[in-house]
């Protein structure tokens, strides 16, 4: 015997290798097969003891030093970043749109992360095979490669809470530590691990409860149900052999299996490991097995369809509660699933491409006949190989062979030199044709501000016919022409019109620097900023406006612009008759002339609407001679005063913003009687008495002292006390003097006051007023008076030069003086402010006699600035002809927008100042320039183009010195070149370092210059400031809404051309031409950024910067052509498909999502087409009835298999092994219900009723009629509430509702399940109680006596009903005879 054992021991093979968990399972199963359970358990005890001893001796511990980073990580990350930079550049050039960029970026980083993961294993094996991290991660005991990869490799891409990829990868690993940004992104991804473990455990418990609820009544009750169906379990190419073996073992064969004429396995044979080995040996192809899916029973299962019992390895016994076992088998690992989810939570693992890298430097060679030229999905050229391809790389010393699998892309040429670790091939991930994809909307937001233009026609989407959503029919570019928009409040720059150039300087250091958008509307008042001229900055550079402190609040319907250079003594108006309008320039002071008067300046007053009526004040001048700083009273003497204008025409806010009417005097002088006024609160104590006389600097109240001495008058009112101090003298008159009791008297100089004691003669005007104290003798207060003589006003001859006065035919301008306060009205001056008593106004009128102008009641004013020969002059232009108002409307065609004439009757509230259409046409060098101004919306926005938005391509150097000489020569001929180069394109001074200057150029017109010849003479091109907006096809487009654009002088920089290069390349440059980045304009130079030509000169171009975005067909564009875009606005929406990443909702949530049959967010675009094609093809092949029948059957079968595979995939990804039969029992229950449809009426079931699939088929066969139903997927919860037992349903949830419904319907519970018997305290029909249940059901079958009784009762009832029917019919016949 010992000899025999020794021989057997000699035959055994000695294995010397590491054994993992899978190999251990195999060993145990082989030991059980050979030696039985008892001997195997003895061996395993020894193995356990050995393991503990070795682990104790080794004393493996995990320290931070054991986490070894991978040396190749640095250059791998650099390589990925380099690819990302190239991708970013292509996106910037407009070659790649945002979605492509996102996809490629994700693929680049995923491939890098995966390659790093593979390198990690190799690195550990070569450098430190006994590393504790390496031993633990690959032993299968704890942890996996993905977690170690995050520790020592890189965390990689994360998903956000919505499941979308964050395209910024985490390049660090946990050993190196994360940056702040990476940490925040990491928190996004690891969101699932933050939730408390207790919550997760309760989730798993609830899942188990629902699972058991659905299948608790499933018990093995028969040996064979007699089914003749089977489900294919043949090995597939994509299926691993291990999974295939696991799927087969434990099932029963459905059909005999033949290899040729020989039967190697019979029907209903149990499949064990021996039979599986025989299948592998004979390579059996068509294997069909029995599963719980095909069992013919409705509420139980047979032994052969279930297969082996998982406990003893034999066929399952009768009475086994396999449903409860299945529910617990799936629910129990749920706790592990949830707890394990934390480690890889959020890390993206997708099925993207895998790269093959060259092992060393060398020349690559492959067989060119085996590959075909193609392009990758990103459009890059490549070679496609259909079969296995061997690639050789010849280095100096060694020859490397690399095997490329089929359907891969070769990314290099044959015989090309490659560097080590260079990507030479791309292996596509094996994705099935029916892999689920989801439809994703990606919104692209603008990262800059400006105007939107597109380079192709667009269609309106039907649901947004009147909106701003457009659909692109073909690939095109969206251009964002640079500029800084400012939201207008509807009245901004109402004086400034198209082509006005402004230089804006903020000189105030006390305020923060503000731009034009600082016009804020609050409480229907607009805080206005004043325009004032700094005389020190006048010169050839133009005039500079100063946005200084807000001057005052003015009414919302009137705008005052202070412009201090107008109407000075040395300034003059110029009015010339130009086609029914006159132009008034405001010239600044020239050199050598007198300095301007120190005054607050002239204010131009033009309403917000731009409408001027007859006798309207065009401008006014506040003379400093008529300005007072204290309170007082104005007196006109005894002359009557009449009001000139209505209250609403002239509105002035000052002081307490009281509305005051303006008056006109008929005398040459008026008087101002000064007085000191103090307004004190009613509760304050006054330290002087009424009618007392005080001196200067006397304390009259707490913290209040008098500035002058004199008589004190105190008037007490409800809430305040008014204290006045009258300076002057006090006289006690004699009995003969009579003075009015009520009002005072103005006395001219020279009058004498005589009595016995004194005689006095007054030199100036005085104001005499009688004062009567209580119970005392009255006295007289004599107060000094300030006399003002009003001059005749400014002579028009001094304002206008003589030659222009003769030409102002229909213009009437007159100077009128207004006194702003009424006769005797008290004027209250606030401290430290001055009061203007008289205002000089320029009143506008036009000729009444002229027939053309006499009927015009309103004219339209606008502000114009004209430049010529570097001299800038400003004008107010008043159009005496009412312009024609046009509406901007949409046409039905796709050509853009057109102008639709409108009589204006339906738009009475339109702002005429903006809705005016100006069209100018003139011919210049065979080019036509068109200008049109569109109707603005209520709040028209502005666009400011600043120096960062445009660029300058510098002077061209062709042959060095020759070019310089030519440049000097051209400067001699045209000295304006030097000035232009210094001032910038618009002739303004360049930016000074210490001065915050902003130069603006206003336009809201679109000018098209079709053909513009390049000219040598710069002086002929003064219209270069004109601005255009056109599309690429040369059509004038009328944008909606119209915008006001402010272009900066420094935004429009020069691009100098040389005549030699122009002649050789082209002869015509068109305005509006769009250039891509690095595109070549002319022969010797490509310019830096993308942009659009704004101005063409003889030797240069001004180009406006533009940002372009690529948009593919089907993309949705938001916004109109020419609309102003703000940063962060949605530009375009792409709709694209992406594969669903199975890792995003992993663990228990994924299982629950599948079992509860929750609808996914979106389905693939091609899925519906596939289903329609399937229906058409199968009905063509099999005919209509059979096609639909088989199609429906296949759909149910396929959906069941798909659900099982999805759940198994989640569990396998977490390393949990569950047999298919458990999942199949659950899936069978949630797919076994059908919904009765309303298409065909049935006597058996009502429409909308949920019934079992087998019950519906059997009922249809029994009644011999078709029952129309459709298959339905019920979730776990719904399936629990739709069982045959209402007691089971009520014990699950919604107890009251379920019991009430069951009572109303009269439902019967046959107590077939476990739960209902437990609730009622009966014996459960499983295990030992199963035999009693079978015996009881047989007794139910023995009911012959009951049948006889029932038949007797039925016969008697039928006879009674028949007798009654005969009586009823005879009565009816008798009645008919009577009536007939």
Curated annotation (Swiss-Prot):
Task: Provide the organism lineage as a comma list.
Answer: Eukaryota, Viridiplantae, Streptophyta, Embryophyta, Tracheophyta
> How the cofactor binds, per note?
Binds 1 Zn(2+) ion per subunit.
Q: Which cofactor does it need?
A: Zn(2+)
What EC number is given for this enzyme?
2.7.7.6
Q: Where is this protein found?
A: Plastid, Chloroplast
Q: Which residues cross the membrane?
A: none
Q: Which organism is it from?
A: Piper cenocladum
Give the UniProt family note: Belongs to the RNA polymerase beta' chain family. RpoC2 subfamily.
MF terms in GO: DNA binding; DNA-directed RNA polymerase activity; zinc ion binding
Keywords, sorted A to Z: Chloroplast, DNA-directed RNA polymerase, Metal-binding, Nucleotidyltransferase, Plastid, Transcription, Transferase, Zinc
What name does this protein carry?
DNA-directed RNA polymerase subunit beta''
């Amino acid at each position: 015997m010992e000899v025999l054992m020794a021989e057997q021991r000699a035959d055994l093979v000695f294995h010397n290798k590491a054994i993992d968990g899978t190999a251990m399972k195999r060993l145990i199963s082989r030991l059980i097969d050979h030696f039985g359970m008892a001997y195997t358990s003895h061996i395993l005890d020894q193995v356990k003891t050995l393991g503990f001893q070795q682990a104790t001796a080794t004393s493996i511990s995990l320290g931070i030093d054991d986490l070894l980073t991978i040396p190749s990580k640095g250059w791998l990350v650099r390589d990925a970043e380099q690819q990302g930079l190239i991708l970013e550049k292509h996106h910037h050039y407009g070659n790649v749109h945002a979605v492509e960029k996102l996809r490629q970026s994700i693929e680049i980083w995923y491939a890098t992360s995966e390659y790093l993961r593979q390198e990690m294993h190799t690195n550990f094996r070569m450098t430190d095979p006994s590393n504790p991290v390496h031993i633990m991660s690959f032993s299968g005991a704890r942890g996996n490669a993905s977690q170690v990869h995050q520790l020592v490799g890189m965390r990689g891409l994360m998903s956000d809470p919505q499941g979308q990829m964050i395209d910024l990868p985490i390049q660090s690993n946990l050993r190196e530590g994360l940056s702040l940004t990476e940490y925040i992104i990491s928190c996004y991804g690891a969101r699932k691990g933050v939730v408390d473990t207790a919550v997760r455990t309760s989730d798993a418990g609830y899942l188990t409860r629902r699972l058991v609820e659905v299948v608790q009544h499933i018990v093995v009750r028969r040996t064979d149900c007699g089914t003749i169906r089977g489900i294919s379990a043949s090995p597939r190419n994509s299926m691993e052999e291990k999974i295939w073996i696991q799927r087969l073992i434990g099932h029963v064969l459905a059909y005999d299996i033949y290899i040729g004429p020989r039967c190697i396995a019979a029907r209903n044979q149990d499949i064990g490991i021996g039979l599986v080995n025989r299948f592998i040996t004979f390579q059996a192809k068509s294997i069909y097995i029995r599963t719980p899916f095909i069992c013919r029973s409705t509420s139980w299962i047979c032994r052969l369809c279930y297969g082996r019992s998982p406990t003893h390895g034999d066929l399952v016994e009768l009475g086994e509660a396999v449903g409860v076992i299945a529910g617990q088998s799936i629910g129990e690992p749920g706790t592990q699933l949830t707890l394990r989810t934390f480690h890889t939570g959020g890390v993206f693992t997708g099925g993207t491409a895998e790269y093959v890298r060259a092992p060393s430097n060398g020349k690559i060679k492959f067989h060119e006949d085996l590959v075909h030229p193609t392009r990758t999905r990103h459009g890059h050229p490549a070679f496609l190989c259909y079969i296995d391809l061997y690639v050789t790389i010849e280095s100096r010393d060694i020859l490397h062979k690399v095997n490329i699998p089929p359907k891969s892309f070769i990314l290099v040429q044959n015989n090309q030199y490659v560097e080590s670790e260079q990507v030479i091939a791309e292996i596509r991930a094996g994705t099935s044709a029916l892999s689920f994809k989801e439809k994703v909307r990606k919104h692209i937001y603008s990262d800059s501000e400006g105007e939107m233009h597109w380079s192709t026609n667009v269609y309106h989407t039907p649901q947004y016919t009147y909106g701003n959503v457009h659909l692109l029919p073909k690939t095109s570019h969206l251009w964002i022409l640079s500029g800084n928009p400012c939201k207008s409040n509807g009245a901004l720059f109402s004086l400034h019109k198209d082509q006005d150039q402004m230089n804006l300087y903020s000189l105030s250091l006390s305020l923060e620097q503000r731009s034009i958008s600082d016009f804020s509307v609050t409480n229907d008042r607009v805080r206005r900023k004043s325009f004032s001229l700094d005389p020190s900055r006048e010169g050839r550079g133009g005039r500079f406006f100063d946005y200084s402190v807000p001057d005052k609040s003015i009414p919302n319907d009137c705008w005052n612009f202070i412009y201090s250079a107008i109407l000075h003594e040395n300034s003059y108006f110029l009015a010339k008759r130009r086609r029914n309008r006159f132009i008034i320039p405001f010239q600044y002071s020239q050199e050598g002339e007198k300095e301007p008067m120190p005054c607050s300046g002239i204010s131009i007053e033009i309403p917000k609407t731009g409408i001027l009526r007859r006798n309207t004040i065009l401008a006014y001048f506040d003379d400093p001679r008529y300005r007072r700083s204290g309170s007082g009273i104005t007196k006109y003497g005894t002359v009557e005063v009449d009001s000139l204008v209505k209250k609403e025409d002239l509105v002035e806010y000052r002081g307490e913003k009281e509305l005051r009417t303006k008056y006109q005097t008929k005398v040459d002088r008026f008087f101002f009687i000064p007085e000191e006024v103090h307004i004190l609160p009613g509760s304050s104590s006054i330290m002087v008495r009424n009618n007392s006389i005080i001196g200067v600097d006397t304390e009259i109240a707490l913290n209040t002292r008098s500035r002058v001495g004199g008589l004190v008058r105190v008037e007490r009112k409800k809430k305040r006390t008014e204290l006045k101090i009258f300076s002057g003298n006090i006289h006690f008159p004699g009995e003969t003097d009579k003075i009015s009791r009520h009002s005072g008297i103005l006395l001219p100089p020279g009058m004498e006051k005589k009595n016995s004691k004194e005689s006095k003669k007054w030199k100036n005007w005085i104001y005499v007023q009688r004062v009567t104290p209580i119970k005392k003798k009255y006295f007289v207060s004599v107060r000094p008076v300030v006399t003002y003589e009003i001059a005749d006003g400014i002579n028009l001859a001094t304002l206008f030069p003589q030659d222009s006065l003769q030409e102002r035919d229909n213009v009437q301008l007159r100077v009128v003086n207004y006194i702003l306060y009424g006769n005797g009205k008290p004027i209250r001056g606030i401290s430290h402010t001055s009061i203007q008593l008289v205002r000089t106004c320029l009143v506008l009128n036009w000729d009444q006699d002229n027939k053309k102008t006499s009927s015009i009641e309103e004219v339209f004013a606008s502000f114009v600035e004209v430049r010529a020969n570097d001299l800038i002059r400003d004008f107010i232009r008043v159009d005496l002809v009412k312009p024609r108002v046009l509406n901007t409307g949409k046409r039905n065609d796709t050509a853009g927008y057109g102008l639709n004439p409108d009589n204006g009757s339906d738009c009475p509230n339109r702002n005429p100042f903006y809705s005016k259409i100006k069209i100018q046409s003139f011919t210049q060098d065979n080019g036509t320039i068109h200008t049109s101004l569109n109707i603005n919306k209520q709040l028209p926005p502005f666009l400011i183009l600043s120096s960062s938005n445009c660029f300058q391509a510098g002077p061209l150097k062709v042959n060095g010195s020759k070019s310089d000489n030519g440049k000097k020569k051209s400067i001699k001929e045209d000295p304006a070149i030097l000035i232009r180069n210094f001032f910038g394109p618009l002739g303004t001074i360049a930016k000074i370092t210490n001065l915050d200057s902003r130069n603006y150029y206003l336009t809201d017109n679109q000018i098209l210059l079709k053909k513009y010849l390049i000219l040598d003479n710069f002086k002929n091109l003064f219209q270069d400031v004109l601005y255009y907006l056109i599309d690429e096809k040369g059509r004038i487009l009328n944008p909606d809404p119209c915008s006001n654009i402010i272009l900066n002088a420094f935004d429009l920089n020069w691009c100098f051309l040389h005549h030699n290069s122009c002649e050789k390349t082209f002869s015509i440059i068109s305005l509006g031409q769009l250039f891509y980045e690095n595109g070549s304009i002319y022969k010797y130079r490509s310019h830096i950024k993308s942009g659009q030509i704004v101005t063409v000169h003889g030797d240069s171009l001004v180009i406006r910067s533009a940002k372009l975005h690529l948009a593919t067909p089907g993309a949705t564009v938001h916004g109109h052509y020419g609309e102003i875009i703000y940063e962060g606005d949605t530009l375009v929406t792409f709709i694209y498909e992406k594969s669903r990443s199975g890792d995003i909702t992993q663990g228990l949530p994924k299982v629950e999502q599948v079992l509860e049959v929750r609808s996914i967010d979106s389905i693939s675009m091609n899925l519906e087409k596939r289903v329609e094609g399937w229906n058409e093809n199968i009905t063509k092949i099999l005919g209509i009835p059979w096609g639909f029948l088989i199609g429906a059957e296949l759909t149910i079968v396929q959906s069941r298999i798909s659900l099982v595979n999805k759940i198994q995939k989640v569990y396998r990804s977490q390393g949990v092994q569950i047999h298919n039969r458990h999942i199949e029992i659950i899936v069978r229950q949630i797919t076994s219900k059908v919904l009765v449809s309303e298409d065909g009426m049935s006597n058996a079931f009502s429409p909308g009723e949920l019934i079992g699939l087998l019950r519906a088929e059997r009922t249809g066969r029994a009644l011999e009629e078709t029952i129309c139903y459709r298959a339905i997927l019920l979730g776990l919860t719904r399936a629990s509430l739709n069982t045959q037992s209402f007691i089971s349903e009520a014990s699950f949830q919604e107890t009251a509702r379920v019991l009430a419904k069951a009572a109303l319907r009269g439902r019967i519970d046959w107590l077939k399940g476990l739960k209902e018997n437990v609730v009622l305290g009966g014996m459960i029909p499983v295990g030992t109680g199963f035999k009693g249940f079978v015996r009881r059901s047989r007794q139910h079958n023995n009911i012959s006596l009951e049948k006889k009784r029932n038949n007797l009762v039925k016969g008697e009832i039928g006879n009674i009903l028949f007798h009654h029917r005969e009586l009823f019919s005879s009565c009816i016949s008798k009645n008919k005879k009577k009536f007939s």
